[in-house]
Amino acid sequence: MKLIRPLIFTMLAATALSAQAAQLPQSAELQYSGSYGIPATMTFTRSGNNYKIVSNIKVPLYSIRFESGGTIKGNTLVPSYYRDVRGGKTYAEAKLGGGRITYGKAGEEKTESISGTTQDLFTLAWQLAVNDGKLPAGLQITNGKKLYKVNGLARNGSASYSIAGGTTTINKYRLQRGDSTVNYAFAPALGNVPTQISYTDDGKTYDLQLKSIKINGKEVKP
């Protein structure tokens, strides 16, 4: 198998801030197959120390768009917002800044003080990728509707994964979010991008399996 040099871990810089920001790609487009074969796309874009993550999932009758954005500080992605948009309308949203978070379904927002780091599940996927499976200190998770404590992250072994006509090794992790479990997997030889994201929210199970990768506009294969 031809190993593709990881794009997330290849650049060095003089300062910690620029080094950590440079380890993320300028852009990434990840195509997934979801539950029942439903297509999903996640894009990551970076401009300087700002980032944006957009995940589009097509479900029966409507589409879901999860969007978050913020800044890169050291080795941490710091969201300033997260939106859950369904059928073109904002279903839930979180706004973060100044040690506070305003979150909730549309028309049901509330504000709380927060400390440590608060991320959504898609931002956390890239956080774990760039930080080699390590959680930021004091992490909480938001899905726009609620705020969850994280009860730990455990390595869950490695496996062979088929993608784009080849195979590669993935490293698996299990995260406890409140009373539910989130499963992640990453492919070190393919830029350590998220290859699997599986979780349940509002009674719906999302099981995303990576099918193709573009990093900085170029297709990446095993």
Task: List where the protein language model places each region.
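Acidic, serine/threonine-rich low-complexity disordered tracts
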Residues: A22-G98, G133-P222
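N-terminal signal peptide c-region/cleavage motif recognized by signal peptidases
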Residues: A14-S18
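Long, intrinsically disordered, low-complexity accessory segments associated with secretion
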Residues: Q26, L124-A125
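Acidic/charged, solvent-exposed loop-and-adjacent secondary-structure segments enriched in E/D, K/R, S/T
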Residues: T102-L124
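Absolute protein N-terminus
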Residues: M1, Q20-A22
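Bacterial N-terminal signal peptides that target proteins for export
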Residues: M1-I8
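Beta-strand/loop-rich accessory regions of lumenal/periplasmic or secreted enzymes
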Residues: W126-D132
